[in-house]
Amino acid sequence: MKENELKNEKSVDVLSFKQLESQKIVLPQDLFRSSFTWFCYEIYKSLAFRIWMLLWLPLSVWWKLSNNCIYPLIVSLLVLFLGPIFVLVICGLSRKRSLSKQLIQFCKEITENTPSSDPHDWEVVAANLNSYLYENNVWNTKYFFFNAMVCQEAFRTTLLEPFSLKKDKAAKVKSFKDSVPYIEEALGVYFTEVEKQWKLFNTEKSWSPVGLEDAKLPKEAYRFKLTWFLKRISNIFMLIPFLNFLCCIYVSRGMCLLLRTLYLGWILFMLVQGFQNIRVLIMSMEHKMQFLSTIINEQESGANGWDEIARKMNRYLFEKKAWKNEEFFFDGIDCEWFFNHFFYRVLSAKKSMWPLPLNVELWPYIKEAQLSRSEVLLV
């Protein structure tokens, strides 16, 4: 009798395991070797790519019938080099157009599945939309979204930021028409989940540094900020821009001194801007919440307060493996500039700052962080 019960329990366990396996969410990232192979597959299946391939048929006939090969050669070279560019542009516009026509369905999926700012919450939304777009002949493959992060980014650039930047009802209706009530409901659900995440983050998931008294800011280790910056260029993300800068130095060797100085100065300025942008791009939503929480809870005022915030965040980002060392911020001044430039400044943004995020879901907490710094100064 006991053996039968054990067998039944095992069979139930196997069935439940199989049910869980069948319910497992499958996204293109699980099927393709990489995002590049997925991208190539999407291009291959696109109408623009097929048209580009068909263009070679009349060109081949022209080559065979023409007595003068110069004109066929010129056209062939144009098709060869400009064709792929047009294919990429058309495919990008086609994706944007296809998604913009399905905003209501996008909103329904968000309302039903209640995702937060955590990318994992968007897996169900991405999988459902992939199936819906393919089954309703909106898209020609089952793999519109490569993974949850791509779906979340599409939500940010298609719904969250454009809708939030519209200040009045008339502007929203003009841009989004019948989708407005669905978007409002979806954003309401999303903001509610983000608020839950923020409250949970500040209580159960709160982080406190250990041994921070031994931590030093880069300003204490480097004589000049330029030295610190040049060391940061060794980061793999900045390798290509830095090599490009060296190439510009070589190319500009024939210019007069004034033009060369202005040209190289502008290139170096763009390199610095690129480095600053990379810092905010590598921060996840959790990192940003920790940054704002650290600012709000810091008791020190003025420059000392920002130094403490910089020291804590340097340790935090290093422990979370978001940065390779404890030198994310040079000092408190750099930390304050980072907050004002990438967080507080976006509150008055009137248009998208792509590729930089507007962090719309963090606007209430950004205001709170700014207010907390002002109150500390007053005290």
Swiss-Prot record:
Subcellular location field: Membrane
Record-annotated membrane-spanning stretches: 73-93, 255-275
Main location group: membrane
InterPro entries per the UniProt record, alphabetical: DUP/COS
Keyword Transmembrane among UniProt keywords: yes
Any GO BP annotation: intracellular sodium ion homeostasis
Topological domains annotated Extracellular: 94-254
Cytoplasmic side: 1-72, 276-379
Membrane topology: Multi-pass membrane protein
Superkingdom, natural source: Eukaryota
Keywords, comma-separated and alphabetical: Membrane, Transmembrane, Transmembrane helix
Cellular component terms per the entry's GO annotation: endosome; fungal-type vacuole; plasma membrane
UniProt family annotation: Belongs to the DUP/COS family.
This protein's name: Protein COS3
Organism: Saccharomyces cerevisiae (strain ATCC 204508 / S288c) (Baker's yeast)
